[in-house]
Swiss-Prot record:
Self-association and partners: The RNAP catalytic core consists of 2 alpha, 1 beta, 1 beta' and 1 omega subunit. When a sigma factor is associated with the core the holoenzyme is formed, which can initiate transcription.
EC class name: transferase
PANTHER family membership: DNA-DIRECTED RNA POLYMERASE, DNA-DIRECTED RNA POLYMERASE SUBUNIT BETA
Protein name, entry field: DNA-directed RNA polymerase subunit beta'
Keywords: DNA-directed RNA polymerase, Magnesium, Metal-binding, Nucleotidyltransferase, Transcription, Transferase, Zinc
The gene coding this protein: rpoC
Amino acid sequence: MKDLLKFLKAQTKTEEFDAIKIALASPDMIRSWSFGEVKKPETINYRTFKPERDGLFCARIFGPVKDYECLCGKYKRLKHRGVICEKCGVEVTQTKVRRERMGHIELASPTAHIWFLKSLPSRIGLLLDMPLRDIERVLYFESYVVIEGGMTNLERRQILTEEQYLDALEEFGDEFDAKMGAEAIQALLKNMDLEAECEILREELNETNSETKRKKLTKRIKLLEAFVQSGNKPEWMILTVLPVLPPDLRPLVPLDGGRFATSDLNDLYRRVINRNNRLKRLLDLAAPDIIVRNEKRMLQEAVDALLDNGRRGRAITGSNKRPLKSLADMIKGKQGRFRQNLLGKRVDYSGRSVITVGPYLRLHQCGLPKKMALELFKPFIYGKLELRGLATTIKAAKKMVEREEAVVWDILDEVIREHPVLLNRAPTLHRLGIQAFEPVLIEGKAIQLHPLVCAAYNADFDGDQMAVHVPLTLEAQLEARALMMSTNNILSPANGEPIIVPSQDVVLGLYYMTRDCVNAKGEGMVLTGPKEAERIYRAGLASLHARVKVRITEEIRNTEGESTSRTSIIDTTVGRAILWMIVPKGLPYSIVNQPLGKKAISKMLNTCYRILGLKPTVIFADQIMYTGFAYAARSGASVGIDDMVIPEAKAGIIEEAETEVAEIQEQFQSGLVTAGERYNKVIDIWAAANERVAKAMMDNLSVEDVVNRDGVVEQQVSFNSIFMMADSGARGSAAQIRQLAGMRGLMAKPDGSIIETPITANFREGLNVLQYFISTHGARKGLADTALKTANSGYLTRRLVDVAQDLVVTEDDCGTHNGIVMTPVIEGGDVKEPLRDRVLGRVTAEEVIKPGTADILVPRNTLLDEKWCDLLEENSVDSVKVRSVVSCETDFGVCANCYGRDLARGHIINKGEAVGVIAAQSIGEPGTQLTMRTFHIGGAASRAAAESSIQVKNKGSLKLSNVKFVTNAAGKLVITSRNTELKLIDEFGRTKESYKVPYGAVMAKGDGAEVQGGETVANWDPHIMPVVTEVSGFIRFADMIDGQTITRQTDELTGLSSLVVLDSAERTGSGKDLRPALKIVDAKGDDVLIPGTDMPAQYFLPGKAIVQLEDGIQIGAGDTLARIPQESSGTKDITGGLPRVADLFEARRPKEPAILAEISGIISFGKETKGKRRLVISPLDGSDAYEEMIPKWRQLNVFEGEIVERGDVVSDGPESPHDILRLRGVHAVTRYITNEVQEVYRLQGVKINDKHIEVIVRQMLRKGTIVDAGSTDFLEGEQAEMSRVKIANRKLAAEGKIEATFTRDLLGITKASLATESFISAASFQETTRVLTEAAVAGKRDELRGLKENVIVGRLIPAGTGYAYHQDRMRRKAQGEAPVVPQVSADEATANLAELLNAGFGNSKD
C-alpha cells in the first residue's frame, strides 16, 4: 500500500514554473519528444477496432488502449506496470499517456513551415532578404535558386528559370550550385552567418539617410538579433521531421452502423504520410526528376494544409465539402483552444432556471427551488448522511436521495445553512453580474431574486433566466461571503454611487407616502411622535398626506463621531413621520421631509452609507423596499385613459404652426428662401410647436385646483397617476407622456433625415394610417439598432478588457509629484460637472493653497473624501492638482495613491485590486445604453445657430486668458489673439462660466471688469473673419494692382465699391508672384512698427478678402482693414454614441484633422504650389524654420507675422489625439480623451468616473519610440515598452552612462493589446497565428504578469486573493527557497485509488 501511495504522490505533483518560453523546435528536439515513427497511414482495424501497428493510432508508439493492459492481452493488471510486451511491443501503463505521447514522421524531403513563410511579414523572406514571390516559386518547384556562385558571374540567392539554369549548366558545368524546393531554401538558411550579417547591416544603417531603407534595415537587424539571442537556428524554419499529435487529442470514435467519426487532423496526417511514403518509394526507384519534383511539391502542400489549411491556395476539403480544420484553426478564433477552453470553461455544480420576484427576501438572500438545491448539493448530502450513520455506503445514500426520503430534506437544510451560492445573469457585463446570496429553500421551480439587486444584474422578470453556481472549497465560500455577497456590493464600481437603489413600485410607494395634500383629513393635528402618526393613520383618523406637526427626535453626529440627540416639533405629514420610523439613527429628519423621488432616495442611501457605514445601510435598504411595496399597494395608483389629459391649447398651437408653415411655403414659391432654408424653417416651427404643446400639457397635468380649509381655491401638485409615476422617477418620462397626451411630433426616416410633416395626433386620440406608417420606421430602426449595438458594445468591452487586464495595484506609493490639474467642467454658462465630483476620492499631488493666502489648506498626498471636498468648496478652490494613473511611476501596475479611492468600497484602494479590468467593465457595461447613430446636424435633432455674441448668466467679474487686444476709437477692446478664453468669476473666486472668444471680437468691458447677469460682453460677425490693425496711421497699398491681384466690385443696392483680392488661381501670369498687402505708415510715410516688436505693420491679404478702404486713408488701432468671408461649414455629421467612443479608444486619426503648429514662432508664407500653400514658422530664437505644405481649401486661422505657440491650432478641424500627444504632451491627450468620452456618456446620462478612462489611456501610452539609444541596447526608431526603457535608464543613470531618449506613442486599444509583452495574452486576443509566429522566431519568454496569461496556464491570478500567493512565490524565489510541494492527503489518495481501480471497469472518454 505504501508504494502505491508513493506512486500516486508522484502522479499528482504539479510543476511550478515562473515563465513560459516559445521557440522553434529543432529536428533533434522533435525526435526527442517522439515515442516512435509513424510509418503507415492506417488508423484502426475496422473489424477488431484495434489500432494498426505503426499507424496513426499505433499502441506501441502512443501507449495502451486500455489501462494497464497490453494490446495482445498477455499482460493485464497493475502488477505488470512498466513491462514492455515482447509480442506486441506495448508498454503496460495508464491509457492517459495516449494524451501526452507524441510520434513523428521523417519527411523524405524538407518542407517549409507555412507560418514562417506566409505569415506577413514573411520571416524566411526577411531573413534571406528575398521577395516572398521568389521564395514561393523556389519552394513549389517553379524555379531554381543559386546557392553557391563559385567562380561564375551568378549571384548567391539569384533566381533562375528552367532555361536559364540549363544555359548556366552548359556554360559553367558544375562550377556553381543551384537547387529548387525546400532543400534549396534550407541550404541558404544554413549558410547564413547571422552575427556577420548583423554587423554589415548595422554599418549600412549608419550610412543610409533614406527613411524607408532605414526602416527595412532595422526590421532585418531586429529579426537577426532575435535569432542570435534566442538560440534559434534559421534552418529550423524548414521542417525535416514532422511531430505527430497524441492520438487522444485527435480521436477516432466508432459510431453505430460501422461508421467512424474522426478529427480532421487524422485526414490531414494521412495525406502527409501517403505522399511521404510515395516519395520515399520514388526516390528508391530513382524515378525521373519531374515525377519526384511533383511529389515533393504535393508533400509540401500536404504539410501546409496540416499546419494551416487555406493559408495558401484553396483549402483542402473533406467529404462534406467543408475545409478541414488544421492545427492552426484548432487554436484560433472564438471556437479555438484559447477562447473556448482556456479562458472560458463550463462549470460543474451549476444549474439555471427562470427568475421571479422575492419581495419578502432580505438583501443577502435568494430563493432556491428545493429540487435544484437537492441536485446541486448532492455530494454534501451524501457525506452528511454517511456521517450521521443514516446510510452505510455512498450507494445507499444515493438511493435515499433518489427516493427523496423525509430525512433528506432535513439534511439539505443543514447543508445549505450559511453556504452561499453565486447567481449569474448573462450577459455578465461587469463584476456585479455575479453576486453571492444565501439560499432560502422554496417550493416551485423558479429562482427568487431580491428586487433591489435587479439594477446591478439589469434583470427583469419577463422570462429572464439565471444560473446558480456552488462554491465548493472553504476558500471559495469565504471569498463569496466576504467579497461577492450582495450586501458588500452596495456601490457601483463605475461611479461610486449606490447601485442598490429602489426603482419602480418602491419609488412610487415612497413618493406617494411622502407627498402632502391640501385640506386632507386630519390636517393641523399635533402629534407626540411617529408612533402616534401611524396609529391615527391606521385608525383612519388622518390621511397619509395630511399636513401635521410631529415631535421628532434626531441623533446628530458631530465630526468626532459622537452623537447627540435633539428633539423638536416639525411641520411634516403623517406619511413622512411613519417613514421616519425605519430611518436609522444618525441621519437628519430633513432627509425624509420632502417628496421622495428616485434621486432623493438614492441620495438618502448614499448619505446613510457615508455617515453610518455598511450594515445600517443594508438594513435600511431592505426596510425601504418593504415599506415602498406596502404603500404602493395602498396607493392604488392605476392608469386609466382619462388620466391622459389633452391640453385645450393644443388645437390652437397646431393651427398657428400650420399657418406659419404655409407662409414659408409661399415665400419659397416666390423665390425668397431656398428649398434647404424652407425645410429647416418648417422643422424648426414644428419642433417649437411640439415643445409648446408639451409645456401646456405638463402645466395642465402637474397641478390641480383644490379648496383649502378656509374655503379658498389654491393650486397643489397633482395626484394624477401618470404624472406621479413620471415625477417620482418610477416609470416613464415627460417625453413619453408627451406622446400619450401631447403630440407625437417629428419622426425620422430610416436614413436619419426628419420628415417635415409631424404626427400631430397622440396615442389617446389615436393615429391614422399614414401617421402609423410613419411611426413604424422608428420602431423598426430601434430594434435593428439594439441588436447591432449589443454586439458592438460587447466587442468594445472585450478590447478594453484585453488592453487593461494586466493593470493591478502593486504598491502603496510610487512617490511621484506629477499629476493632472482638475478644474470643473464648464460649457458656456453652465457647470456640467463641479470640481467636487471630479476630485472626490483622489489623492492630492501637491499642497492645495487657500486662495488669496499662503496657507496650506490640504497637505500633499491627502485622500480627498467628502469632508475635504466640503472644505474645498467652502474656500472656493477652483483647481486642484491630483495624482493620476497616467502619471504613476510604478513599473508594472499602478500605486494606490495614484489611483485613489476604491469606488465600490469607499476607502483607498487595496493592493492587488485589478483596476484595469474594473475600468474596462465600467466603460463597457453602459455601452449598450449608448446610441449607434451618427447624428445629422440638421432638422430639429441638434442645430446650433452660429454664435455671434457672449451673454453672461451670472454676475461677477471677467477674466481673460491668453489674450492680446487693441483698444479702438470707441474705447472698446478688439481681440487680436486666437484661442482666447473668457471666464466669469464669482465673488469667491470660483469659475462659473467659460467661453471661447474668436479673433476680431469686440468687447465692451475688459479683464477684471464687473458685469451683471444677462449682460452681453462680446460681439462678432460669425460669417466673416476680419483683419484688425494693431496700430494707427495711414494706409498704403502694396502689390494691390487692379486686374492683376484685385478687382473692384460695386454693390448694386448700396452703390458702395469694394476691392476683392483675387485667389492666386485667378491671377494672370505676372500677378502670380505678387503678394497684396496693406501697410500702415505714419504721416512721413515711414513704416509703423507693431508694438513690442521690430516688425513693420503690414497685413498680407489672402484670396477672396474684401477691402472697403482706399489708399492713404487714416485709420485707428482696432479698425477692420479687410474682411475674409467664412464659408459656413456645411452640415457635418458628428459621430455620436458607441462608434465615437470606439474611435477615441482606437486613437483613430480623423478624416481632416486640425493642423497644429509644430513649433513656436512667427508665421509667414513661402512659395505656393498648384494646390498647396507653404506655411513657414520661424522660431524667435533664430533656429531653423519649420515648413509645412497645406492644401488651399483648408481655411487658415493665422495671418502672416502672427506669433503662435507650439500646439496652437493653425487650421480648424477635429484634433487628432496623436498630434495632441506629440505637441502638447501626455496630460493634454489624457484630458482630451477623457473629456471626449465623458461627453458621449454624459449625453446618455451615464456617470463614469474619470479614473477609469485614465486607466485605459495609461495602457494606450505603454509604448514609446526610441529617438536616441544612448548606451542601451535598443535600436533607434524601435518601439519599446515604456517600463523597460525606464528600468534601463535608471540602471544607466546609476552607472553614469548615457540614457536613452524617447517619445511617447499613443496606440489604439487593439494595437496596444497585440503589442503587449505577453505573447500568450496577445495570441488569445486576435491574430493568433501572427502573434505566435513572431514570438517563436524571437524566442520570447512570457513572464506571466497579467491576469489572462495566468488564467490560461491555470494558476491563481496575480490580483485579488491570488495576489498574496504570487507575492509569496516571488519572495521565495528571491530567497532561493524550494517551492512547497502540495502534500497528498489521505482522502485524496483514497479517491485516486478508487479512480484507478474503477478504471478497469468503465473506460471513460472525456
